[in-house]
Amino acid sequence: MALLLVSSSSSYALRVTIFLSFFFFLCNGFSYPTTSSLFNTHHHRHHLAKHNYKDALTKSILFFEGQRSGKLPSNQRMSWRRDSGLSDGSALHVDLVGGYYDAGDNIKFGFPMAFTTTMLSWSVIEFGGLMKSELQNAKIAIRWATDYLLKATSQPDTIYVQVGDANKDHSCWERPEDMDTVRSVFKVDKNIPGSDVAAETAAALAAAAIVFRKSDPSYSKVLLKRAISVFAFADKYRGTYSAGLKPDVCPFYCSYSGYQDELLWGAAWLQKATKNIKYLNYIKINGQILGAAEYDNTFGWDNKHAGARILLTKAFLVQNVKTLHEYKGHADNFICSVIPGAPFSSTQYTPGGLLFKMADANMQYVTSTSFLLLTYAKYLTSAKTVVHCGGSVYTPGRLRSIAKRQVDYLLGDNPLRMSYMVGYGPKFPRRIHHRGSSLPCVASHPAKIQCHQGFAIMNSQSPNPNFLVGAVVGGPDQHDRFPDERSDYEQSEPATYINSPLVGALAYFAHAYGQL
């Protein structure tokens, strides 16, 4: 990322600090979180819970409003944001307004956006019944994504998978409301296949169709019909989208794991959404070819094998689909790999107890793994069974305790005694790597902030003037260290796919501790 060097003199730093402090009050309209009711996390009614999971749940969903692209509604709660990207898609004469910015930049990447949507939907499918007043907000967050995905898949055998030139966008530090970099549009089709992004999009639409089946049946039918056609396209024209669009999607969201995992994942969601025997047969015939038995212990926007195994295991354990019996063993293998001290455990943990997969945005694996642990524990409980790791047995309760340890670490039970969610607890990241959050809001600074002007603020040590409430950052390193530096995108950047599985986990714990 190209950075503009700025003066390091104390007088310059002081001017920037005063500048941002002024805009903090104008943009947020309240004092610092430790004294604001919006950020109050000390009103627990249940002494058994160390954390206010309900408060964290509310904020984890609110975060998505800060990532919105397009025309914002009148009930927008993240009030420092304004409309943006209103001409998206015009480069190819299509309407691609809406959707989410993936992280701290102003690009709409379809691959992680679809995964975010799938995981938000799965969170609601498994734990939405526990969310009470937050269920509607979660559905709104899902629909903001699916409305966009319907636009992106409106033409047969074509998916618009990205809006914006990431390389040019990353050379600027400007608010989404000001962005003037080229809004290039990239697509996959018969000539440039993208089975990975297409199958993930099909999974997202199918999962969302389940979410809206009762509350909005007509919309649900639209989603499911589109999911079926998009999956057919993904399966017929095989290939990774990054092979044809490499300069534009790599290294940002390259499909490193290939497309096989997404085809299995997409088929699993369509089987769940349609109950059509053809998807079950597809899985039976193609499962091994698509990597059902491959050993991998990472679940995230790139590799979906673990999620597919656990989803398919439910069909065997709870719905008694005997032909999927082998997936119980595959799912157990994944779970065994993340249980500390279990036979075949292969997951690293920090000295403070955080699951650690990689330096870049590690918290995404913490939240996704925690969600899978809780979801699998739910399935195991329903079937009155356990996890088998060699000669050892692990109960659903053990899985829940591991997930709780991870969520609690994220919320503040860690060596630094800080929350990694913005706005939760008295101490949390103040300099997140996020353009809109770090720059003065439009209400306080109506004048345009040019492409390179923003780097003066990006490189400063001043706290962000706008709170992206609920944002979970990449997190600490393998030694539990966190510098809270805006330039450190690996540790300080939030992302939609970090939050989406966390929504389900927080709903579970909020209910379990009587907060919902």
Swiss-Prot record:
It holds the Pfam family Glyco_hydro_9. Keywords: Carbohydrate metabolism, Cell wall biogenesis/degradation, Cellulose degradation, Glycosidase, Hydrolase, Polysaccharide degradation, Secreted, Signal. It is an enzyme of class 3 (hydrolase). Its main location: secreted. It comes from the Eukaryota. It is found in: Secreted. Its EC number is 3.2.1.4. It catalyses: Endohydrolysis of (1->4)-beta-D-glucosidic linkages in cellulose, lichenin and cereal beta-D-glucans. Residues 1-29 form the signal peptide. PROSITE patterns: GH9_1, GH9_2, GH9_3. GO terms for molecular function: cellulase activity. InterPro entries: 6-hairpin_glycosidase_sf (IPR008928), 6hp_glycosidase-like_sf (IPR012341), Glyco_hydro_9 (IPR001701), Glyco_hydro_9_Asp/Glu_AS (IPR033126), Glyco_hydro_9_His_AS (IPR018221). One of its GO terms (cellular component) is extracellular region. SUPFAM superfamilies: Six-hairpin glycosidases (SSF48208). The active site is at D105, H433, D484, E493. GO terms for biological process: cell wall organization; cellulose catabolic process. Gene3D superfamilies: 1.50.10.10. Belongs to the glycosyl hydrolase 9 (cellulase E) family. This is Endoglucanase 17.
